[in-house]
Amino acid sequence: MADVVTMKQLLEAGVHFGHQTRRWNPKMAPYIFTQRNGIYIIDLQKTIKMLDDAYNFMKAVAEDGGVFLFVGTKKQAQDSIAEEATRAGQYYVNQRWLGGTLTNWTTIQSRVRRLKQLKEMSEDGTFDVLPKKEVALLTKEMDKLERFLGGIEDMPRIPDVLFVVDPKKEKIAVHEANILGIPVVAMVDTNTDPDPIDVVIPSNDDAIRAIRLIAGAMADAIIEGKQGQDDEETLEVDFKENADGSEEIVSAEENPED
C-alpha cells in the first residue's frame, strides 16, 4: 500500500518544522530528527509511518459506522477543521471548547436543542411578530450558540474518535476524551506531551498548510471507510435478496402445483 502522503507533500507543507529547542517536551525526543538554527526538525520518516497508522485506524472505525469529532480552535486550524470534517460528513469544534462537551453531554444536548429552537423561530416567522429588542437578544443568543455548537449540532451521540490539532492547546478536550475512553488521534508538535494521545502524528501544528494536509488525510480515511461500509451493506442486501429468491425456488420445487 502506498503511503497516505508523500515526503514531498510533508516537506512542502512544513510538517517537519517543530518548535524552538528551548520550548520542547523531552517525551517527543523519539520523533525528532535534528535541530537547525534553534528549531527542532521532526523525523518525517516516522511521521509517514504514524500517519499511515492513523489513516488505517480512522478508516477502520469509519467502516464500523463510527462518529468522529475534529477539534482545532487555534486560528490557523479553524477553517481546515470545519471544511475537512464537513467534507467527511463528520463534526467539529473550531471555536472555544466548552467544558463538559463530552463529559456533560446531556447539558450540551439541551443547548443544541435551544439552538435548533431559535433557528426554527427565525425561519417560521416568529421573530417577525416579536418586539425588536427581544429579537435582537434572541439573535445574539442564537449566533453565540451557533458559533460554539454549530459544528456538533447534528452529532447523534458522543464521538467514537477525536482528531485534534495541538493537544496542548486542546488539553481540556483531550482530558475529557481520556476520562471517557475515547481514542484521540492528534497532530503532536515538539512542545507537547504525547502520553495522553492514543495515535500520535508528529507534526508542525502551527502551519496552515500542514494542518490542512493532515486533516485532509484524516477526512480521506473516513470517506474511504464509509465507502467500504456502504459496499458491505449493499452486498448484504444483495445476498439477502438472492437468498429470498433461492428459498422461493426451493419451496416451489418441494411443493409443485398439481
Curated annotation (Swiss-Prot):
Highest taxon listed in the record's lineage: Bacteria
One GO term describing the cellular component: cytosolic small ribosomal subunit
InterPro entries in UniProt: Ribosomal_uS2, Ribosomal_uS2_bac/mit/plastid, Ribosomal_uS2_CS, Ribosomal_uS2_flav_dom_sf
Gene3D superfamilies (UniProt xref): Glucose-6-phosphate isomerase like protein, domain 1, Helix hairpin bin
Coiled coil: none
Family membership noted in the UniProt record: Belongs to the universal ribosomal protein uS2 family.
GO BP terms: translation
Keyword annotations: Ribonucleoprotein, Ribosomal protein
Native species: Lactobacillus acidophilus (strain ATCC 700396 / NCK56 / N2 / NCFM)
The name this protein goes by in its record: Small ribosomal subunit protein uS2
Pfam families associated with the record: Ribosomal_S2
NCBIfam families named in the record: rpsB_bact
CDD domains xrefs: RPS2
